[in-house]
Amino acid sequence: EYLPETYSGDDVGRITKGAALMLKADMYLDMASYKKFHQGEEAKELWKEAASLAKKVIDLNLYGLENDFAFLFKAAANNNNKEVILAHQYMEDELTHMLPVLCSPSGVGVTGRGWASFCPTRDLVDSYEMTDGKTIYESSLYDMDHPWENRDARLKKTFMLPGVDILRPDGSYTPYMPHPAYNNPERINNEGGGITGYMYLKYNDLELEKVDASWTNFSLYRYAETLLIYAEALNEYEPYNAEIVWAVNQVRKRAGLPGVDSQLGNQE
């Protein structure tokens, strides 16, 4: 209760009231989940407390969802934008990390440098819904010849996908095509190299020249998680509460997905 709601100047990034409330909400959610799903015991009061703490963050009226999901993971977002509640703070030329070079194959971005160290799996890519809210296995919108179309808007902003135009060192945008031998270790550093054929755009700034010294902050708690903690906890102890749908649908709307049904039960 003694923490300030916001900081200014050099103190931006320190623990705020919202960050403390989020940490507590997260802890109560974990305790409730463990008690219910591992110990098989009633956890109603823990769910209730998790929801109450998340609601306190919402009621601060300090946070909101950024319109552009991709913006959250660029160096330009180091102003600790309205969605960020707590982030690991980095500073250009003083405290940096190497995520851009680790997330890219060679031949992309303004530098063309990349180590292809982090490669998402096909299962993860396939888990992103279609714009009708169905999976790729259920939706009539899914087209195997154009698998990235009519998908959750976050898909193309999170992953470097085969066939999708990507920034090149000469300033052009041409399709990213994994190397035919991308699963051969000796070709891993070749153009398009990568173990799975997919790479990350999240926390990867292709316009950044210092790819091995990025100062993009790493978000620990965002407002999107506040909404989802609130919805999950509330759903466990008070199913069909209208606030559940309200919270979930804010996140889905930004992703270009249809809202969940107001009669959605807590097992769905």
Name each model-derived stretch:
Residues E1-C103, W115, D132-E268:
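Acidic/polar-rich alpha-helix caps and helix-coil junctions
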Residues S104-G109:
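C-terminal/domain-terminus segments
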Residues G112:
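NTP-handling and nucleic-acid-processing catalytic cores
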